[in-house]
Structure formats: structure tokens, C-alpha cells
Regions:
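A glycine-rich, hydrophobic/aromatic-adjacent loop/helix-cap motif
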Residues: 330-404, 471, 558, 564-569
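Hydrophobic alpha/beta core scaffold segments
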Residues: 402-405, 415, 419-449, 453-462, ...
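A short, gly/pro- and small-residue-rich
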Residues: 225-246, 356, 423-437, 474-476
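Flexible glycine/proline-rich, aromatic-decorated loop/lid segments
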Residues: 259, 445-480
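Long, low-complexity segments enriched in small/aliphatic residues
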Residues: 352-355, 518-618
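N-terminal leader/propeptide and maturation segments of large enzyme subunits in energy/redox metabolism
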Residues: 120-126, 284, 288-318, 484-561, ...
């Protein structure tokens, strides 16, 4: 055994521990270099030992665009909170946003440029210099551009907005390529299409939950994962508790109880894919009851003739009395609001469903008034780029082009379709046919592992950028993100990488900026110049400093709001196609309901240990994937909690343990999205299963979006058990009569005892 003398032992103890913390044991010889704690030779400008400094920036953990404020000490980020001045989140921040520090300090970050040395996908890489990596990419792109083959270059990015999106567009325009795609599994393309069809507007509306008195949600988990949950949570709370008049009433319609369903006054389970029929049945009743008397009333009556309450009740499984009661309450409460999304929008008739929800708002008079649906004005900065959001059809077409040799270079910016796109799109096979794949990701995700070159980007806490939230908050808003710490590793900002490539390709005139910060300043100078003389700052420098310091800016001289004009042909086109499912009901008796969680999102949170340890708010499960089954269904199949089942669709199969969950329809099973990574670091790899991988390529014909709620599955009991890690115990009484019952299920003595408790009920 190697010996160590007293003096060396004391040195090790002074370094932090008796050797163990340094990565080796005392029983072994010391082979690793000694690491010293070196103070700043040139400390940051605002460095003050022991004094915290706060920087305002923008959260990019999802697409909501919340403002954040980051506490730093001694040049290190310590805590992230919401920016109180930002109108989207107003000082609040979700758990995923709080975990942004673990993106910055994640031990699995890519720390330097790398080039592939082994077979593609083998994980064999070597470090290279930035000059070498950028030159390899620039030389290939320059050659393609000179030969007029620019359209063989594809830039595939996560969803980005603002001047970075504009920079991508300018770069690809110079390449002569129209293949700039933004792909995210969560992009609400169906909602955009429905609003474009019904209103002729391309922007998402503002849903005024704060001022509504009656909310009908058709599948939209507005408190959990839908569009901007922090902002919607604020509106929900104020409608419920901060009103001087009657508190808002909330009704949630969905096949599986979400966070929003648990917080609602009433949860209603409609047959999957029939939510739009329910909306039209309510609209039919409003017309029949005289709740709408507009000049186009007769046209609406004719259009909705087939959606009587009786026929809708038969289709949806919801009693006619319930439909009439909801319709009356919705029409008679002012203001009221109907929203749609989530699984209701994830069916083959998703666009029809959301158009029906818009029609319900129109007939109830909820358009353009506080507490209803308000369309946002145009963003303060609109990108004039070639970019477009890619859906399943677009990605399948890209894969087909790659297999046919029409894609020579693929550049990836934090997009991970290997995890978030069903295999039926053919994307994995397509990668084998692309000569050069370049990734700008900060992590080794599934798609980055297939790259030839990796040019790793800074995290959002190390970068300059900006954002213009979509949907807005009723007036134009812009946010600026700034570096809150110096870069930890040999990485570069995404915008700076693109600008350096442009310089090496001789595109200085088209993209003349030295770095992303300079591009931002020039872009925000245009915004400053548009402001009225009465509201603008004394100089641009004063304006820029104030925006960076505050982290947010709102346009004081708002533009005229878009008018609510319904296309004349829309009323005649109102119809609900029956939902189509992949797999016949005999062989595949259950409808798979994949859902987003507020921790994992589309899987991007899986490499953050805080998110892995955060209990699911509805089931209290952590760390894995599970299959939620109704108790009646579980009993009929002989299943209990922890039974390992095989979930099989027409596209594949996966295994997960059973979790008996009473808040789900008997013919529906639910699985959370986010786990099942084969790469993406130590915290995410080989944990749980990914239900996206067994989704069938069932599309919404109107848009090409994936109908991700339209896959049928069957369950096969493997006879094995798996331990579910839960923090919430069980939801069953085990015969102990813990939960007292009232109504027909209660005994007369128990009923009398419950009714003896003095309860005051607020008037409706």
C-alpha cells in the first residue's frame, strides 16, 4: 500500500478533505494534478466579495419568455427568481425556470469543440480548436454556396425568437437556402391554424384569465404546461382570490385529470377527440335559448343544425343536462372565456376543435373584451426571415430529402428530433445519408451524438440575446438577456458562432456585426427610433442601459389592436370530423394519452437532477415513467400498482410500471413525456421510457401536425414488478374509512354528522 507522511496528509486536509474529495483514495498513490483555488487576478467590474449582485435576463427553459433576475456573488450565479417588472411572469417562476442554474453548472456540459473520430453515433470524439472547427464548417458551406447548391444546407433549430432568429434567417438567405426550420414537439401549430382560419390573424391571442368570471378549458392545462403556465397561474389566482366581486369559476374538460383539472371547480371527462363536438353542442343550445341575436344568427343556426344537445351527448358521453347547464352558465356569465389545447388539439380533428372553441367565444360575446379573448398587437420586432416552424409532415419531408441525397449539411441548434419525433418520420435513418452534421448544442443529446462536428454554445445565462413573447400580454413587450456570469468553458454564444462562420465565408457585408451584442444594440436602436418623442429616453445609450438593467421593455405608444373579423365563409365551414385513431379498437382497446409535465417539458428537463427529484404534482412519482390506469380497468386486467406492463402500439412497444389513477377515463391510459433518453447526460440517460417513440404517424390533414393523442395501444402484463418511487403514499383508504362520504354512498348517521358541520356557501 502506498504510504503518505504526516505533512502530505495535512496538505490534503487543507485542500478540502483527506483526499477523497479530490477524486482519489488515500490507499492509492496521488496521480492527479493538484488543483489550487486561485483568486481573480482581474476581478469583474462589479465584483465585491460578500455582496450579491442581481442581473435581469430572460428564461429560455420553455417558450413562454418569462423574465428572470439572477443573484450572483463573487462572479458565480447562486439563485434565479422571476423578474417582478416583467409582465409575463411578474416576479414568479416555475420549477423548470428555477433549475436553470443546473443547466449552467451541469457536469455533463460540452466544454469545447469536438470532432467525431469513430463511427457516427459511436460517441467517439476528440477535442479540436475553435479555429479548426469553424474552418471545417465554413469551407464546406462556402464550397456549397459557390456551386449554387445552397438549398442542400438545412438549419434545424429549437424555437427561437427575436434577433437571433433574424440572424439565422439572414445567414440562410445568404446561403441561398430556404431550409431554416424551427422544430419543437410543443409548438401549438394547431392553435395558430385555427385562429388563422377563424379570425384571419397570425398571432396568438391573449387569454384574460385574470378578469374572467367563467372559464371553460377544453383540454388546455393552463396551470401545468400550456403556452405560458406562470402567467396563466397568476390570472387564475387573481380571478379566484383577488376579485372584489364574484370569484371566477373554472371548468376543465379532458380525459385525464391535469393540474388544471385538479384546481378546477368541475372536472368533466369527455371521450377523446369529441371536445369540439361538445363546444358546438353548447353553441347550438346558446342559439336555441336565444343567447345570441347577431345579424348572422340564422346562418349560425343552419351551420350548427347537426349538433343538437341530444346528438352531442351521445357522441361525447356527457349527459345532455350537463351540456345545457354549462352552455347557460357560459352564455349568461359576463365575461366568460373558452380556451382549447393540449390533448383536445392533439387529435386528427384538432383544428376543427379549436375553431369550435373560437365559435363558442364568438357567440357568447367574449371577443375583444376584458375577461375574454383579446388579440395581441404585432410584436415590437418581427423577424423577416425564411424560417418556419416545422411539424411532423415537414420533418418527414426533410428526412425523405436527406435519404434521397438532397441534404449535404445539417446544422443543429439545440433541436433534438431523435427524442421528440416519432421514429416513423424516418429521421434516424436520414442522418446516415447526410455527409456533414454540425451541432451547436450545449449537451450531448441523442441527435448531437450523431454529429460530425460539435461547436458548443454558451448557456442562456452566459449569452446576450432578446425575446419578444408570443403570445403577448396585450401590448408589445421585449426582453433583453445578458450574461450573468463569465463563460465557464471554452464555448461561444450561438449568434457569435454564426457571425464568425459568415466572416470566414466572406459574408461580412450582409452580416457586418462583430458579435451578437452589437447586433442587439443595432436592432434595439430601431425600436428606440420608433418611439414617440414624448415617451423616448434622452438618448439611445440611456434607453439601452435602462432596458438591459430592467430586463424588459413595454411599448408605451401601443399600436391599434387587431380587429375581430370573422371570415364570411367561416360560419358555413363549421364542422367536426370524427376523430381518427391509429390501430383498431379490438386489437388496441386503449387510447394513449401522452402528456407534458411541468418538470420535464418535452424532455429538456431530464438532465437536471432537481427536476428528476421533483414529485409529479398529480401522482407524486419521481425519477421514472409510469402508466396511469383507471381503477376499474386495472381490476378487470388484474393489474395493481407497480406491475410492469408492455405498452404496444402499431409502431412499437415500451415497458413501464402501472400506477392506478382514478382521474382518468376507463378506456384511456396516460404516460408522461420527458424520460427515456439514451443520451443527454448521467441524470437523464437510461431512465424511464419515451411514449413519443410509439406514437403512430396519424396527422391533422389541415396542418400536417402530429395527432399525438390519436394512437391506440394495448397492455400486456409481463408478470414482473417495478418499484414506483413516490413521495405521496397511496390514494386508497385500505378499508380504514379515512375519507368521509356524503350523498347516496354515505350512511344516514354519517350523512347527518357531516351535515351538522356549519358550512357557509357563497351565492353563485
Amino acid at each position: 500500500m502506498a504510504k503518505i507522511d504526516r505533512r502530505d496528509f495535512i496538505k490534503l486536509v487543507g485542500a478540502g478533505s483527506a483526499g477523497a474529495g479530490a477524486g482519489f483514495m488515500l490507499a492509492q498513490s496521488i496521480k492527479h494534478p493538484i488543483e489550487y483555488l486561485i483568486p481573480y487576478p482581474v476581478p469583474p467590474e462589479d465584483f465585491s466579495p460578500g455582496i450579491a449582485t442581481w442581473y435581469n435576463s430572460v428564461c429560455t427553459m420553455c417558450s413562454a419568455g418569462c423574465g428572470i433576475t439572477v443573484r450572483t456573488r463573487e462572479g458565480r450565479a447562486k439563485k434565479i427568481e422571476g423578474n417582478p417588472s416583467h409582465p409575463v411572469n411578474q416576479g414568479r417562476l416555475c420549477a423548470l425556470g428555477q433549475a436553470g442554474l443546473q443547466v449552467l453548472y451541469n457536469p455533463d456540459r460540452l466544454t469545447a469543440p469536438m470532432a467525431r473520430t469513430g463511427e457516427r453515433g459511436s460517441g467517439s470524439f476528440e477535442q479540436i480548436t475553435w479555429g479548426d472547427g469553424l474552418s471545417r464548417v465554413a469551407d464546406r458551406l462556402g464550397s456549397i454556396r459557390e456551386d449554387g447548391r445552397g438549398d442542400s444546407v438545412c438549419f434545424l433549430s429549437e424555437g427561437v425568437r427575436g434577433h437571433l432568429a433574424d440572424l439565422f434567417g439572414r445567414f440562410m438567405e445568404q446561403m441561398g437556402s430556404g431550409r431554416l426550420l424551427h422544430y419543437e414537439f410543443t409548438h401549438p401549430g394547431t392553435l395558430y391554424a385555427a385562429n388563422q382560419h377563424f379570425f384571419g390573424e397570425q398571432y396568438l391571442p391573449y387569454y384574460d384569465l385574470q378578469n374572467t368570471r367563467f372559464l371553460l378549458s377544453f383540454g388546455a392545462d393552463y396551470l401545468g404546461s400550456w403556452i405560458s403556465p406562470v402567467h396563466h397561474g397568476l390570472g387564475y389566482g387573481r380571478s379566484r382570490a383577488a376579485r372584489h366581486d364574484t370569484r371566477g369559476r373554472f371548468v376543465q374538460i379532458e380525459p385525464r385529470m391535469s393540474i388544471s383539472g385538479a384546481a378546477a371547480d368541475e372536472w368533466i371527462a369527455a371521450r377523446p377527440g369529441t371536445e369540439g363536438m361538445l363546444a358546438l353542442g353548447m353553441a347550438h343550445h346558446i342559439l336555441a335559448a336565444g343567447g345570441y341575436n347577431g345579424s348572422d344568427r340564422e346562418q349560425w343556426v343552419a351551420a350548427l343544425d347537426a349538433y343538437s344537445v341530444g346528438s352531442v351527448a351521445a357522441s361525447t358521453g356527457i349527459p345532455g343536462d350537463t351540456i345545457r347547464r354549462l352552455a347557460d352558465r357560459f352564455a349568461q356569465t359576463n365575461p366568460s372565456l373558452a380556451i382549447g389545447g393540449g390533448a383536445a388539439a392533439g387529435h386528427s380533428n384538432g383544428v376543427d376543435t379549436l375553431v369550435a372553441v373560437n365559435a363558442l367565444n364568438y357567440l357568447a360575446g367574449n371577443l375583444g373584451q376584458a375577461g375574454g379573448l383579446l388579440f395581441n398587437t404585432a410584436p415590437a420586432f418581427e423577424t423577416t426571415t425564411l424560417s418556419r416552424h416545422a411539424n411532423f409532415r415537414t420533418m418527414a419531408e426533410l428526412a425523405a430529402d436527406a435519404r434521397n441525397g438532397r441534404i449535404e449539411v445539417l446544422i443543429l441548434n439545440h433541436a433534438n428530433p431523435m427524442h421528440t419525433l416519432p421514429p416513423s418520420a424516418g429521421f434516424r435513418e436520414a442522418l446516415d445519408h447526410i455527409p456533414m452534421i454540425v451541432s451547436l448544442s450545449s449537451f450531448m443529446d441523442e441527435t448531437t451524438a450523431m454529429a460530425d462536428l460539435i461547436l458548443p454554445s454558451h448557456t442562456y445565462l452566459e449569452s446576450w440575446g432578446d425575446d419578444f413573447p408570443e403570445p403577448g400580454v396585450g401590448f408589445p413587450v421585449g426582453s433583453v438577456s445578458q450574461p450573468v456570469v463569465s463563460p465557464l468553458y471554452n464555448t461561444r454564444a450561438t449568434g457569435d458562432i454564426i457571425l464568425e462562420l459568415a466572416r470566414k465565408m466572406g459574408l461580412d457585408e450582409a452580416l457586418p456585426w462583430a458579435d451578437m451584442k452589437q447586433r442587439l444594440r443595432e436592432g434595439w436602436k430601431d425600436i428606440y427610433d420608433r418611439e414617440s418623442a414624448a415617451s423616448k429616453a434622452s438618448s439611445f445609450e440611456a434607453f439601452w442601459s435602462s432596458v438591459v438593467e430592467a430586463g424588459v421593455w413595454g411599448e408605451k405608444t401601443g399600436r391599434a389592436a387587431a380587429a375581430f373579423t370573422v371570415k364570411p365563409e367561416v360560419i358555413d365551414s363549421i364542422a367536426m370530423a370524427a376523430p381518427e385513431f391509429a390501430g383498431d379498437s379490438d386489437s388496441y382497446p386503449f387510447i394513449l394519452h401522452p402528456y407534458l409535465t411541468n418538470a420535464m417539458h418535452d424532455g429538456r428537463g431530464a438532465n437536471l437532477p432537481w427536476m428528476q427529484e421533483l414529485p409529479d404534482p398529480m401522482t407524486s412519482v419521481v425519477y421514472g415513467t409510469w402508466v396511469e390506469i383507471n381503477p376499474v380497468t386495472a381490476q378487470s386486467l388484474g393489474l395493481s400498482d407497480g406491475d410492469l406492463v408492455q405498452v404496444e402500439s402499431t409502431e412499437g412497444q415500451l415497458s413501464a410500471p402501472v400506477l392506478i389513477f382514478p382521474g382518468i377515463m376507463p378506456d384511456v391510459i396516460a404516460m408522461p413525456i420527458g424520460q427515456g433518453h439514451s443520451e443527454y447526460g448521467r441524470y437523464a440517460k437510461n431512465r424511464g421510457a419515451n411514449p413519443i417513440q410509439i406514437l403512430a404517424p396519424q396527422l391533422q390533414s389541415a396542418t400536417g401536425d402530429l395527432a399525438w393523442s390519436a394512437t391506440r395501444v394495448r397492455l400486456v402484463n409481463t408478470g414482473l414488478k417495478a418499484n414506483l418511487v413516490k413521495t405521496g403514499g397511496v390514494s386508497r383508504e385500505l378499508g380504514r374509512d379515512i375519507i368521509q362520504k356524503t350523498g347516496t354512498a354515505a350512511s344516514s348517521s354519517q350523512h347527518a354528522a357531516l351535515n351538522s358541520i356549519p358550512i357557509k356557501v357563497a351565492p353563485s
